[in-house]
A protein has these predicted regions:
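Intracellular juxtamembrane helix-capping segments at the cytosolic ends
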Residues: 133-146
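A late C-terminal transmembrane helix in Major Facilitator Superfamily
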Residues: 143-181, 185-188
Length: 207
């Protein structure tokens, strides 16, 4: 694992010493930014996972079967993106993957509510592919910040991600009931713009 490069073993009194790459204050700040990125990612992903089929049926009048096939295409894209995010981060750096995956999805998410059926499918595939590649990079970046708390970091980020997705599904469902399903995607389309906070993430130098 990449984060093991930051672990220094010292044979003093039989103890293992682990060096943090940043000060405690900068580490907390960086983790807060990463959680903000998880927040934006999983709100938008929840809108697609939970309501994409209803959106297609309502806006384009497609059948239930067709809408489910379109959802399957989106889910395939998310699987590919998730698998690709880690190796790409190893090659070009976690921060660059986070930049590209969160903020890079913004043009697609902003455009999707304003195009026809075919382009909606194409853009949703692009969003799924790009946005899903963020989580492996975010998780590994966080583990590099706290290499001696890998279990804590994994639990925190997975728990926060699932929690945000669950709450977002309920909130977005209520929004759809009051303002219409199209309003959900008009609003959620702006969520990837929170990727701009990646600017404040420090660069972790390889040792």
């Amino acid at each position: 694992k990449a984060y093991l490069s930051r672990v220094k073993w010292q044979k003093k009194s039989g103890e293992t010493h682990v060096e943090m790459p940043l000060s405690l204050g900068k580490t907390v700040f960086s983790i807060s930014i990463l959680l903000t990125l998880i927040f934006s990612k999983y709100i938008y992903m929840a809108s697609l996972n939970s309501y994409y089929t209803f959106y297609l049926i309502h806006k384009f009048g497609v059948s239930v079967q067709t809408s489910q096939i379109c959802l399957f295409v989106f889910l395939i894209a998310t699987a590919i993106g998730t698998l690709a995010g880690g190796p790409i981060g190893d090659k070009i750096g976690r921060k660059y993957v986070i930049w590209g995956s969160i903020l890079g999805a913004a043009p697609f998410s902003l455009l999707m509510p304003h195009v026809g059926f075919v382009w909606t499918i194409v853009l949703s595939f692009c969003v799924g592919l790009v946005l899903s590649s963020a989580f492996p990079a975010i998780l590994l970046y966080a583990q590099e910040l706290l290499p001696y708390k890998l279990g804590l970091i994994s639990g925190l980020f997975f728990g926060f991600a699932f929690g945000v997705a669950g709450i977002a599904s309920a909130v977005l469902g209520n929004m759809a009931d009051h303002y219409g399903i199209e309003a959900v995607y008009n609003v959620c389309g702006f969520m990837p713009l929170l990727g701009l906070v990646t600017w404040f993430l420090p660069n972790l130098k390889k040792k």
